[in-house]
């Protein structure tokens, strides 16, 4: 096991700049750094929604294959979001990115890709019902999932494998 450190806290005055840095590192495709900075912000400002959203996105940026551990961590953060709309929308985003991670694996994982994308569409439908006027982000994501399912010819997996009779 590695060495144990006591993490240092940033000052309240540094929160806004730290959130900017987290967003910057995420856009530079450095999700681990964005995750770390977001956690530092949330340690001193647990109600900082922007830092929480960046954390969720940074965790989903790290999905490979199913990304189950990162997905659980992302979903834990989703439950802390303030509105039902955000909870539904970002739960959809987590499911969508899990599905897309499965899709990138190919082979049998494609059936899991379908499930992730279909689950995302369900969350996006719920978010769409809760949206503010003029905010169609959930529709845009729903359409992207639908297009991927159709383009890739994804199908749900069979629950019961067929028995081979000889």
What kind of region is each of these model predictions?
Residues 2-5, 129, 133-166:
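Terminal, low-structured helical/coil segments at or just beyond the last alpha-helical repeat
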Residues 5, 33-36, 77, 118-119:
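Intrinsically disordered, low-complexity regions
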Residues 59-80, 90-124, 151-165:
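Short coil/linker segments at helix-helix boundaries
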Residues 44, 80-81, 130:
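Structural marker of alpha-solenoid helical repeat scaffolds
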Residues 13-40, 105-108:
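Alpha-helical segment of the N-proximal tetratricopeptide repeat
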Residues 2-17, 79-80, 111:
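TPR-adjacent "capping" and linker segments in tetratricopeptide-repeat scaffold/adaptor proteins
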Residues 13-17, 45-59, 83-106, 136-148:
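Amphipathic alpha-helical repeat scaffolds of TPR domains
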Residues 7, 41, 77-78, 127:
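Canonical positions in the second alpha-helix
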